[in-house]
Curated annotation (Swiss-Prot):
Main subcellular localisation: cytoplasm
Enzyme class: ligase
EC number(s) given by UniProt: 6.3.4.4
Key words, A-Z: Cytoplasm, GTP-binding, Ligase, Magnesium, Metal-binding, Nucleotide-binding, Purine biosynthesis
Keyword Oxidoreductase: no
Protein name, as recorded: Adenylosuccinate synthetase
Residues annotated to bind Mg(2+): 13, 40
């Protein structure tokens, strides 16, 4: 089997898009199987930037089939807006397939997302207000509307009417809102979407399964990151899906034994968006410098990301829960110009040293980083394409990460463009 899963191994925003785009040029099939358009990643090809939220990264390769799997919560309006971006540049989108089992996001999901976040007050969790959580709630409550329902206008009308009646009761009685959702408006809007996406809809599980069985190269594209996983992340400051390797198989509609390699995407430092404890966060000039040099602002929200030093406790945890077989080390060039670079090797909580990532956020908030300090480098590394040509201190930094995490670094990124990538092992080989 030639199947590779790409997993964000921190809090997301690690640079997955670049790695996925790089590997997508070799892949026959690219699959997204969790989350929705709350996640964003940017592809840079020949100086042109494409901000993707729903569409898999293989769309730029006309020979690659791009799957939006059953584990996705699908915003048809957002999807069609992304399509326009490619049509403007005359890029074909005929290679996209949408699972008929994917659940659909509606306006009431987005409104309830915003109302719920507002009602939390000081306990807000930092939602993107894209309706992701409420849509997954309907899914687990077994009242959600799927793509296959949307394709049948009569069945869709019955299900939508029931949902709008229920959501209007919530909006009116819990949140005290007088402006309610109108069935006819939403029904007609989504019938229009249904006709526009109909040609893309398929049983994508069959497509992925057949591709794997045929020995084709299949790339599973993760969104967000391990520490945002609903079960394994920094709960409750997490997403509503499973952006870990275990969730990818379910979201693609195949068995877990069909994913051979799991590549962890890891930044050379650490960032986070939203609320929650962040042990190595630098609320100082160091954090500001990382943010400015790394252009650390969210693709989807534009929010400035919180920045800090590399945290080996986090990445070692990600290696364990994902079964990482390889690491792609991203944004190494951002650390150029730092005299000293710190790496968090463990946590100190009271008089105890902790090497495993704690479940309790109260415990995590009490933790202080235990750092090992390494010498930095000043040389420009953005044009280097051979690992041996990196500055000695940069190579030592990568070696230290491998030592602490216990997984080999097989790819190193030294700039945003596809060409600015150092390959130490061909992951699809």
């Amino acid at each position: 089997m030639k199947t590779v899963a790409i997993v964000g191994s921190q809090w997301g925003d690690e640079g997955k898009g670049k790695v996925i785009d790089y590997l997508a040029t070799q892949a026959d099939v690219v699959v997204r199987g969790q989350g929705g358009n709350n996640a964003g990643h940017t592809l840079v090809v020949e100086g042109k930037k494409y901000a993707l939220h729903l569409i898999p990264s293989g769309v730029l390769n006309p020979n690659t089939v791009n799957i939006i799997g059953n584990g996705i919560v699908f915003d048809p309006k957002g999807f069609l807006e992304e399509l326009e971006m490619f049509k403007t540049d005359n890029i074909s989108t005929e290679n996209i397939k949408i699972s008929d089992r994917a659940h659909v996001i509606f306006p009431y999901h987005k409104e309830l997302d915003a109302l719920s976040e507002e009602a939390r007050g000081d306990l807000k969790i930092g939602t993107t207000k894209k309706g992701i959580g409420p849509c997954y709630m309907d899914k687990t409550e077994r009242s959600g509307i799927r793509i296959c329902d949307l394709m049948d206008k009569d069945k869709f009308a019955i299900k939508l009417k029931a949902q709008i009646d229920a959501k209007n009761e919530i909006v009116k009685n819990i949140y005290g809102k007088e402006e309610l959702f109108d069935f006819e408006t939403i029904y007609n809007e989504y019938l229009g979407y249904a006709e526009q996406i109909r040609k893309y809809v398929a049983d994508t599980s069959v497509i992925v399964y057949d591709a794997v069985r045929a020995g084709k190269k299949v790339l599973f594209e993760g969104a967000q990151g391990t520490l945002l996983d609903l079960d394994l992340g920094t709960y409750p400051f997490v997403t509503s899906s499973h952006p870990t390797s275990g969730g990818f198989a379910i979201g693609a509609g195949i068995g877990p034994n069909m994913i051979k390699d799991v590549v962890g995407i890891v930044k050379a430092y650490t960032t986070r968006v939203g609320e929650g404890p962040f042990v190595t966060e630098q609320i100082n000039e160091t954090g500001d410098k990382i943010r400015e040099q790394g252009h650390e602002f969210g693709v989807t929200t534009g929010r400035p990301r919180r920045c800090g030093w590399f945290d080996a406790v986090i990445v070692k945890y990600a290696a364990r829960v994902n079964g990482l077989t390889s690491i792609s080390f991203m944004l190494l060039d951002v650390l150029t110009g730092f005299d000293k670079i710190k790496v968090c090797t463990s946590y100190k909580m009271g008089d105890k040293i902790i090497t495993d990532f704690p479940a309790s956020l109260d415990d995590l908030a009490k933790c202080e980083p235990v750092y090992e300090e390494l010498d930095g480098w000043n040389e420009d590394i953005t044009q280097i394409d051979n690992f041996d040509d990196l500055p000695e201190n940069a190579k030592k930094y990568v070696a230290k990460i491998e030592e602490l995490v216990g997984v080999s670094v097989d790819m190193v990124s030294v700039g945003p463009n596809r060409a600015q990538t150092i390959i130490r092992r061909n992951i699809f080989a």
